[in-house]
């Protein structure tokens, strides 16, 4: 009822939005908690069309507001015909950017152009602002994920220091095992475990059993998981095997400065993500570095969600209650790269009316050996100490471990 009015309907094919709107999960596709479906939402009822053979829990079969209907291939058309006969529909909304050609054919066959109404982000804008219950669930998921990542880094470094042969594939496997041991159902995307020069590849995805961790290698871990509540986690940390070179400390510290500046921003309601993006890039740009990706994306049922964006092109405001990433990086081809990613919650500032700030959900300490403290301003040093104290309380600070 927050999205559509009387005699209106909304056709949805975006699986994460369907899963969020009806608060159901299926884990039907790799690295996702969604279920396969199409959906028509009315003001007080949702009709969910699912492929035959997909199990539906008994408690959902007699739900007062959700009606699950099994359909064969092409069966969506017949369900739309039935919908048209049984309900007075003056307008049916759909997303022009995501509807498939097949689904649009069905819609345009049943509804004329006057009724069929393209409209973007009707669900995404509502889903972006998390409820108090959802925020609690996110905090619970990240508390588990933080421990899994911290344990992985400790395990890998311990094995390396004990002179074990630890490969990129071992690094990958160790990460996924630690998530599973902590109660994760699956990963929220394929784990990125990059060793040495592979850390300079932004979305590295081919861990090798032949790439053995060596002294001086940068190790980049970008990973996430789903727990029972079905919301995604996503965090990146970069650390070092052995002792770092000066160039490694420089790029790590510049990335850290950008993360600290962005994460500690205080900004007016209505501020666009582009303003925060500039804060993250400025420290490295002063020394000639930059990165070819956005600084932040939303997170929800999927690891990437609309409604929250931090990039040079972000032209929408950051809203209270939204959750997303801050993830600056520097990547030097054939040498190595650094990315640091925290997931944050946008909250009203506790002291300043009309202002917002970020609260980190990711609480995993930074690599002390890679920080050049002389490069940090006094303000950034305070920011770092405050963040490490949060991590220390969760047992996830390398500074105090």
What is the meaning of each model-derived region?
Residues 1-401:
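Active-site neighborhoods and metal-handling regions in enzymes and metal-associated proteins
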């Amino acid at each position: 009822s927050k999205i559509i009015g009387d005699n209106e309907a909304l056709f949805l094919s975006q699986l994460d939005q369907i899963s969020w709107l009806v608060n159901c999960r299926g884990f039907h596709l790799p690295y996702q908690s969604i279920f396969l479906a199409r959906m028509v939402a009315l003001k007080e009822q949702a009709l969910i069309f699912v492929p035959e053979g997909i199990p539906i829990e008994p408690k959902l079969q007699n739900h007062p507001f959700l009606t699950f209907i099994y359909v064969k291939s092409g069966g969506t058309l017949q369900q739309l015909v039935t919908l048209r006969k049984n309900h007075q529909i003056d307008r049916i909304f759909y997303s022009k950017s995501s509807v498939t050609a097949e689904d649009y054919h069905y819609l345009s066959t049943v509804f004329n152009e006057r009724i069929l109404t393209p409209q973007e982000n009707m669900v995404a804008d509502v889903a972006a602002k998390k409820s108090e219950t959802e925020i609690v669930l996110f905090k619970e998921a990240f508390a588990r994920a933080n421990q899994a990542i911290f344990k992985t880094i400790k395990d890998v470094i311990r094995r390396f220091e004990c002179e074990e042969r630890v490969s990129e594939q071992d690094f990958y496997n160790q990460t996924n095992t630690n998530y599973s041991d902590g109660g994760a159902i699956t990963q929220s995307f394929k784990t990125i475990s990059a060793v040495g020069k592979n850390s300079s590849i932004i979305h590295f995805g081919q861990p090798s059993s032949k790439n053995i961790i060596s002294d001086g290698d940068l190790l980049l871990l970008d990973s996430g998981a789903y727990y029972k509540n079905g919301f995604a986690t996503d965090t990146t940390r970069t650390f070092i095997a052995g002792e770092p070179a000066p160039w490694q400390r420089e790029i790590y510290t510049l990335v850290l400065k950008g993360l600290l500046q962005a994460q500690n921003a205080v900004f007016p309601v209505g501020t666009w993500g582009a303003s925060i993006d500039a804060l993250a890039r400025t420290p490295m740009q002063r020394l000639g570095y930059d990165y070819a990706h956005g600084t932040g994306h939303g997170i929800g049922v999927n690891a990437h969600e609309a409604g929250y964006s931090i990039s040079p092109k972000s032209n929408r405001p950051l809203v209270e209650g939204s959750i997303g990433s801050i993830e600056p990086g520097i990547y030097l081809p054939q040498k190595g790269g650094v990315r640091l990613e925290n997931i944050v919650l946008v909250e009203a500032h506790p002291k300043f009316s009309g202002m917002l700030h970020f609260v980190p959900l990711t609480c995993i300490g930074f690599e002390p050996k890679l920080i050049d403290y002389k490069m940090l301003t006094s303000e950034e040093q305070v920011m770092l100490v405050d963040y490490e104290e949060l991590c220390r309380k969760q047992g996830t600070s390398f500074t105090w471990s």
